[in-house]
Each structure stands twice: as C-alpha cells, then as structure tokens.
UniProtKB/Swiss-Prot annotation:
Its main location: cytoplasm. Specifically dimethylates two adjacent adenosines (A1518 and A1519) in the loop of a conserved hairpin near the 3'-end of 16S rRNA in the 30S particle. May play a critical role in biogenesis of 30S subunits. This is Ribosomal RNA small subunit methyltransferase A. Pfam families: RrnaAD (PF00398). It comes from the Bacteria. Its EC number is 2.1.1.182. GO terms for cellular component: cytosol. Keywords: Cytoplasm, Methyltransferase, RNA-binding, rRNA processing, S-adenosyl-L-methionine, Transferase. SUPFAM superfamilies: S-adenosyl-L-methionine-dependent methyltransferases. It is found in: Cytoplasm. It comes from Streptococcus sanguinis (strain SK36). GO terms for molecular function: 16S rRNA (adenine(1518)-N(6)/adenine(1519)-N(6))-dimethyltransferase activity; RNA binding. PROSITE patterns: RRNA_A_DIMETH, SAM_RNA_A_N6_MT. S-adenosyl-L-methionine binds at residues 27, 29, 54, 75, 100, 125.
Length: 290
C-alpha cells in the first residue's frame, strides 16, 4: 500500500485529524501511476539529490526517496511535519524542513546534503496560488538546479512553455525560457486530487540551459522591456513602450530610433516577438539611453 492510495490517504488524514487549509493551496495527489510517471519524467536515480516543495503527507516524497540519493522537502504547514515523520519513518534519506521556501537560505540547506556535489533537481506539486513566485525565486537564486519537474495549474504551464504568436505567450514565457527549456510532459486531471481543485494540472519539465537563451547588455532591463511589452496585450509594441517610457517628443524619437535599430515595426504586438527580438529591442533601447 502506498501513501497516495486513496484509502491510505483518507486514513492518514483521519488518524491525525488533519483539515485542509485553503490559504496553503493544499491538494493531495491520490494516483500512484501519476506519481511514478513524475519520477520517471524527472529521471531520478541514486546520483541525484532532490528538492521538493510542499510534500503534503509525503505521497510524492515516498516515490522520490525510493529513487533519489537524498530528498529535502520544504513544508510551510507545521501541522504536516508530525504526519510526515510518521508516513516517511522508514526512509533515512529524507529531510523535512518546516520553512517557507521563499524565505530560507537555500544554499545553506543544500550544503547539508550528504553529497552536495550531486546534481540537484526540483520535483514538486506546487501550490497554485504561489507557483510563479516560487519558480522565479528558484530559477533566479543562482543555485544550479539541473532540472525542474513540477506540477502546476495547466494554464500556467501553458504560459511558461508558450511560443511566440500564441495566446499563452507572454512575459512569463520569456522570464523562464531565458534560463530554461520548458515543455509540458503530461496533463493531470483534477479528479485524482483530494480535495479536487477547480482546474486540471500539468507536469512541466524544465531543463537549465548551459547559458541564457540570448545575450543582453542588461538582464534586468531586458525583463522590464519584455514585461512592459505585454501590459496591454491587444495594443501595439509602440503603445506599450510609450506607456512605459513616456510620450515626450524626445522619448518618442529615441523609441523610433531603437525600433529601427532592432528592425521592428512599431505596429507589431509583443506576442509576435521571439526572445532574440526582445534581446535586440532591449539592447537598442539601452543604447538610446532609455
């Protein structure tokens, strides 16, 4: 019997008198086939350390611990810590950290792995309400995670992995794909969770690039420009850029020169631009002193 078997999950919750907190976005997976598929997608073996976020009662953790060298699971809900101590008691390669992943010194914890030099993968069922902040925090942390295999709301997974000229493509696609390749591995129906969420989920596989997808003069500025270009999706690049940088004649002159330098039409929409075109645009705007 597995932790994720529906009857076992129910028994664990009842035994510990656990009630779900909406504020933590708790939805526990009760399908062992999907859990195995997640581990297979992440290609976990004894030469890999794993960071898990939001282990819940340990359904995914159990599968990860069987395959990985070590698992470090960050759980914000202190009510779940004694439950995890119970459900994972047979594993000596799991550390549960009762902390908010957004607030810890992650490098310090990673140094505590028995073999901290092994590749580190992030495998998690992320809370819907805070998926993007967690992902960006980890991606931008400077810690060289080799791979992320994470479950999230299907719509968010589609946005992250989207390509130009699609409805889902936006600043989030650019922010992630600058650092990682991103691909939806498979869809997870809502009915396999307790409690069932209102939407389906997706498993997103992201692999870190050896170097960023494009070269830019100023990374922060590149992300600001891409974000500004999607503020009003139906508006042209020109309208979004003038809204962000200003509408004085001097600014308009600089914007015109930058667009010409980047070989972009003012009437194009942000969703049509590739990462390479955004890089050219950001560098051109920077060169114009904007």
């Amino acid at each position: 019997m597995r932790i994720a078997d529906y009857s076992v999950t129910r028994a664990i919750l009842e035994r510990h008198g656990f009630t779900f907190k909406k504020s933590f976005g708790q939805n526990f997976l009760t399908d062992t086939n999907i859990l195995q598929k997640i581990v297979d997608t992440a290609e976990i073996d004894k030469k890999v350390n794993v960071i898990e976020i939001g282990p819940g009662i340990g359904a995914l953790t159990e599968f990860l611990a069987e395959s990985a060298a070590e698992v470090m699971a960050f759980e914000i809900d202190d009510r779940l810590v004694p439950i995890l101590a119970d459900t994972l008691r047979d594993f000596d390669n799991v550390t549960v950290v009762n902390q908010d992943i957004l607030k810890v010194n992650l490098a310090q914890y990673i140094a505590e792995f028995k073999n901290p030099d092994l590749p580190i993968k992030v495998v998690a069922n992320l809370p819907y309400y805070i998926t993007t902040p967690i992902l960006m925090h980890l991606i931008e942390s400077g810690i060289p995670f080799s791979e992320f295999v994470v479950m999230m709301q299907r719509e968010v997974a589609d946005r992250i992995s989207a390509q130009p000229n699609t409805k889902a493509y936006g600043s989030l696609s650019i922010a992630v794909q600058y650092y990682m390749t991103a691909k939806v591995a498979f869809i997870v129906p809502r009915k396999v969770f307790v409690p069932a969420p209102n939407v389906d989920s997706a498993i997103l596989k992201m692999v870190r690039r050896e170097r960023p997808a494009v070269e830019v003069q100023d990374e922060k500025f590149f992300f600001k420009v891409s974000k500004a270009s999607f503020v009003h999706r139906r508006k042209t690049l020109w309208n979004n850029l003038t809204s962000y940088f200003g509408k004085s004649e001097e600014t308009k002159g600089k914007l015109t020169a930058a667009l010409e330098r980047a070989e972009l039409s003012p009437s194009v929409r942000g969703e049509a631009l590739s990462l390479e075109e955004f890089a050219c645009l950001a560098d051109a705007l920077k060169s114009e002193g904007l």
